Structures are given as C-alpha cells and as structure tokens.
Regions:
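Bacterial N-terminal signal peptides that target proteins for export
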Residues: 2-17
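N-terminal signal peptide c-region/cleavage motif recognized by signal peptidases
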Residues: 26-29
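Extracytoplasmic small-molecule ligand-binding "clamshell" domains
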Residues: 32-108, 118, 184, 247-248, ...
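Periplasmic-binding protein-like
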Residues: 49, 127-135, 207, 214-253, ...
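Ligand-binding cleft/hinge of the Venus flytrap
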Residues: 56, 71-83, 161-184, 214-218
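Extended ligand-binding regions for polar small-molecule ligands
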Residues: 64-78, 139, 143-147, 151-160, ...
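Acidic, polar ligand-binding/catalytic clefts
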Residues: 71, 75, 83-147, 221-222, ...
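A ligand-binding cleft/hinge motif common to bilobed small-molecule-binding domains
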Residues: 93, 109-119, 164-172, 189, ...
Length: 293
C-alpha cells in the first residue's frame, strides 16, 4: 500500500506544545477518569490524521493502525457501557489538550519520553520505537557500527530521537570514535531529501518510521541496524486517570492475547513485537530500566 508521507514536525511549535502541555498539566489537568466516563456514557479520544502508518487519510477515508484498533476499542468500551468519540486534531497542541482535560486520552503514535512521563502515564506499548537508521540504497560504506564513525547524520530538531543520540555516541566510543556532523531538520521529509541527494550519510528515526520509509521508497533507501536501546510507542493517559489507565491496560491484554495486536502490527508496521512490556509505563525510572538506558 502506498500512502502520503507525514510531515509531522518537531519544530519550535512542537517544543512550544510540550511546554504548554507541562504548564497545562500543572494548572488544569482534570481529564475524566473511568467513573466519570461511564457516567457521561462516552470517552473522547484525541487523534491525528497525518501520521502514517498510525493515522492518515487516503482518498478522503481514514486508514492506518489506529483506525482499525479504534474499532476494537469501541467494541470493548461498549461492552462496559460507554461509547468512544474520536476528535481529530493536528499534532501540535494535541498532547497539551489532553493534559488540560479537553480529551480523555491521546489515541495516536506517541513515543514514551522522560518529559511526557512527567505529565502522563502510558498504556502498555503497542509498538517498538527503538531507533534505527536509513541509508541510501546500495551505500556499501556503511556495513557495521564502526562504519558510522565520522559519518554525517540527520535527525529531527527537538525530537526524542535527538535526545537519545548520546546512546549512539557511547556505542561508537567503544570503537574509539564519535558521530560526525549532526544535522537537525524541521521535518523528516527534509532529512530524507538530503539523504537521497548525498548531503547526509544516514538518518536516524524510530523503527516503524524507518520500516515505512523503506516500504514506500525502497528504490532509494534501505534500513540499517539499531542505534539505541529499546524504545516504546503508547497512548498517553493523564496521571489523574488511574482507572482509565487500568481499563486501557485490560484492552491491550485482550487484543494481545487474542492475536489481534500482532496481526495489526504485521499489517501496518511490517513486523510484530512479541517482547514489548505488558505493563503500563508510569515513571522515568521504569522507562529507563525497560529501555536499558
């Protein structure tokens, strides 16, 4: 399947959104917990529609991993007496809106990070977000870890991936070398364009994004190997909603045990992730332990 590439950005606007998120959480976070949701009969989830392969639009119709999983979540919720309402928002401001209590949860492909864990708990992860790299197809200069020494790398400015670049630096230090020039971009499509034209030697992104890039542009790029410890994608839940977190943990257990989660992972991400944590991620310390940081 071909689909449009998301320009989901981690620009200054995204940094501002995170700052707003942190401030909003400290002042006004009052998202409904499960008892309140059941009382009003509906859970409102914030999603986006420009982040393939999670949520995106093809010919005016929603597609993606979360489009299908939302159907399962709706059925699971109805069995417990309430409905699910979807609100589509741009990524910028989505987490801030959830933190401020305007929506009950973010139902999108959010990476677990230290900053976000200070505002949210995360339901059990639905995908790996370990960091891999893409290189130009046929570039035989890069074959192993040592061959990354001194090479120019591209990442998105302000991203979780940039924040974990020291892990690659530590790996390369064992080969008595370091990363080369680090180029920061406002969006990944810009970085991929510079990789294609030779300005970069490789680009680091989360595993699913690299898989999606190679799936849709395999004539230009190929997948490298992991350059970080484990990483995770999950749904952010306000910390003041522990019952909702428990509800979503139960939902994840159901789709995991039934094989539905693995089937959707294979379909949309190109591989299943049987070794993901099965518990919610609720603290920076727990995240670092799970990720081997």
């Amino acid at each position: 399947m071909t689909h449009p590439k998301s320009a989901r950005s981690t620009s200054a606007l995204r940094k501002l959104a995170l700052a707003t998120c942190l401030l909003g959480a400290s002042l006004t976070a009052h998202g409904a917990d499960l008892a309140d949701i059941k009382a009003k009969g509906v859970m409102t989830v914030a999603t986006e529609d420009d982040y393939a392969p999670f949520n995106y639009i093809v010919d005016g119709k929603p597609e993606g991993f979360h489009k299908e999983l939302l159907e399962d979540l709706t059925a699971y919720a109805k069995a417990q007496g309430f409905d699910v309402k979807q609100e589509i928002l741009p990524w910028t401001g989505l987490l801030a809106s959830v933190a401020a209590g305007k929506y009950d949860m973010a139902f999108t492909g959010a990476l677990v990070t230290d900053d976000r864990l200070r505002v949210f708990n995360f339901a059990p992860p639905f995908a790996s977000a370990q960091h891999f790299f893409a290189k130009r197809k046929g570039d035989d200069r890069i074959t192993d870890l040592a061959s990354l020494c001194g090479k120019t790398v591209g990442l998105q400015a302000g991203s979780a991936l940039l924040a974990r670049l020291p892990e690659l630096k530590k790996m390369l230090a064992e080969h008595n070398c370091d990363v080369g020039q680090v180029m920061e971009y406002q969006s990944y499509p810009e970085a991929y364009a510079d990789l294609a034209n030779g300005r970069l030697d490789y680009v680091i992104n989360a595993l699913i994004s690299i898989n999606d890039l190679v799936k849709t542009r395999g004539d230009t790029f190929e997948k490298g190997f992991a350059v970080s410890g484990d990483g995770f994608a999950g749904w952010p839940i306000p910390k003041k909603s522990p019952e909702l977190l428990e509800f979503l943990s139960g939902f994840m257990k159901e789709v995991r045990d039934s094989g539905r989660l693995a089937a959707l992972q294979e379909k949309w991400f190109g591989e299943a992730f049987p070794s993901l944590p099965v518990e919610p991620i609720t603290s920076v310390e727990q995240f670092h332990s799970l990720a081997g940081m």
